[in-house]
Regions:
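Sec-dependent N-terminal signal peptides
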Residues: 4-12
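Kelch-like beta-propeller repeat domains
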Residues: 21-330
Length: 330
């Protein structure tokens, strides 16, 4: 049965002197929408023309799939569309110019005895024909990258192989990649957001596995002067987190690491305000998750479909959590 559950939490302003805020004097509503058809984590998520696409990922095992699940906001329902051309996990996806672009990732990868291959392939999905078309590949093969769209172009930074600092931008109209200055802090499994012509990258880890050293660093790339700048770090180091820009704010969710507790998953919803260089901790995710590569914002709600509920890639879930936040940063 389809149910919508809302949790409304009124908060009080508590400012600290070191640039971090625990709470904000604005309500934050957490709720739920129709669950995914199949459990998933480490998948690519993007919004295109009012629909949310969930591409590839791990179901409840570390065997990647080619499934593409589509959520229709208007009917609160999921469907399955044309499979991705290959099994995939840890890819990036964005919706731009009427097409869904899926970039890089890893093929197959299953368990300790299965070999994983990083790929540079880029495919575009046309929702009108439900077909995939191959496009120009990335300059380097990688997965678990930071990505977002700024002024119609797709920026992709870092990722695995471990300690990757590659940074490039893709122009969908020209079908061309351009290499940019390296990400200063090489890392993977981080969150990113494009705000006012700048590309923000937060958190991540330095090694390949989820027990690797993690970071709280925040670095920002100015797409005009082509320079990186360090900003205030997150209040706590996290990897396997995800992020999205809403009303000029950089929202980050979840993450994984043994320091997060028994499940190894962070419940954090922490927001960065570029105008004040401050981080604000909003009410936690009701069901903590990691491994949702990309989020979707539509009709005033941020959608977090699926995600892993324990460290690693074998705990994909069907949860579809949403949050309505009134915080504005512009």
């Amino acid at each position: 049965m389809k149910r919508i559950i809302l949790i409304v939490i009124a908060l009080t302003v508590i400012y600290s002197e070191n640039g971090y805020t625990r709470d904000k004097a604005q309500p934050s509503e957490w709720g739920a929408r129709e669950p995914l058809i199949e459990p998933n984590s480490e998948m690519a998520v993007a919004l295109l023309d009012g629909k949310i696409y969930v591409v590839g990922g791990y179901p409840s095992t570390r065997i990647s799939v080619d499934t593409v699940q589509v959520y229709d906001i208007s009917s609160n329902s999921w469907s399955i569309t044309t499979p991705y051309p290959t099994t995939i996990n840890h890819a990036s996806a964005v919706g731009v110019n009427g097409a869904l672009y899926v970039i890089g990732g890893q093929t197959n990868a299953g368990g300790r005895n299965k070999k994983s291959s990083y790929i540079s392939a880029v495919y575009a999905f046309d929702p009108k024909t439900s077909s995939w078309t191959i496009r120009a590949p990335m300059p380097t093969a990688r997965s678990a990258m930071a990505h977002d769209v700024i002024n119609g172009k797709i920026y992709v930074a870092g990722g695995r192989p471990p300690r990757g600092n590659d940074f490039a931008v893709y122009d969908p109209k020209a079908d061309k990649w351009t290499t940019l200055p390296d990400l200063p802090t090489a890392r993977n499994h981080m969150a990113a957001a494009g705000i006012s012509g700048k590309f923000y990258v937060a958190g991540g880890r330095f090694g390949g596995g989820f027990r690797s050293e993690i970071t709280s660093v925040l670095e920002v790339f100015d797409t005009v002067n082509k320079m990186w700048t360090a900003k205030r770090s997150m209040s706590e180091a996290r990897s396997g987190l995800n992020g999205i820009a809403v009303e000029g704010c950089f929202h980050t969710f979840g993450g994984e690491h043994p320091t997060a507790g028994s499940s190894g998953v962070f419940p954090h919803h922490e927001v960065y305000d570029p105008m004040t260089d401050r981080w604000t901790r909003l009410p936690d995710i009701p069901i903590p998750v990691h491994g949702v590569t990309g989020l979707a914002y539509i009709n005033d709600y941020i959608h977090l479909p699926g995600g892993g509920t324990r460290m690693g890639g074998s705990s994909g879930s069907m949860y579809h959590q949403v949050v309505h936040v009134l915080m504005k940063c512009n």
